[in-house]
């Protein structure tokens, strides 16, 4: 197993962890209002009213966000399989070729999720339009983690494909 394979494996693992954290954290969209802060995630929606304890419930997702969640979960599975194949490539060199293609599939799934997610900004809790959030609403830390997972997946693919050679 060469250094580039190890580097790409670490990048894929980091992307996998960031994607899992983005789903687990309910901060994809944040209203940040002082009276009642609302954070909307793909698996939980949390609200804090006038300094009381934060209350979380499962959200009613629009079809666009269900599709986004599906693509992210499939991308996570792809990156997990990729990491396993990169470990297996220590004994069977041809596993690297399959790992690259599965990681590429994961990247496509993540990019599709990133394109589809903003279409769901029209829901009542957010109050925006497709691809346009209202002025008082911002994307939260979960979305940033998800974008980082896309970035690490792309850089990992560059190393796995030996496109990005050091020195």
From Swiss-Prot:
> Taking the first listed entry, what is the main subcellular location of this protein, grouped into a coarse class?
membrane
Q: Name the glycosylated positions.
A: 135
- Biological process (GO), any one: lung development
- Keywords from the named record: Cell membrane, Cell projection, Differentiation, Glycoprotein, Membrane, Transmembrane, Transmembrane helix
What Gene3D superfamilies does this protein map onto? Answer: 1.20.140.150
Q: Does the keyword Lyase apply?
A: no
Q: Could you tell me where this protein is found in the cell?
A: Cell projection, Cilium membrane; Cell membrane
Indicate how the chain sits in the lipid bilayer. Answer: Multi-pass membrane protein
List membrane-spanning regions. 7-29, 68-88, 101-121, 139-159
**Any one cellular-component term (Gene Ontology):** ciliary membrane
For whether the record's keyword set contains Nucleotide-binding, the answer is no
Please name the PANTHER family in this protein's record: MODULATOR OF SMOOTHENED PROTEIN (PTHR31186:SF1)
Write out the function statement from the record. Acts as a negative regulator of hedgehog signaling probably by promoting internalization and subsequent degradation of smoothened protein (SMO) present in the ciliary membrane. Plays a role in sonic hedgehog (SHH)-induced spinal neural progenitor cells differentiation.
Name of the protein in its database record? Modulator of smoothened protein
Q: What is the lineage of its organism?
A: Eukaryota, Metazoa, Chordata, Craniata, Vertebrata
This protein's encoding gene: Mosmo
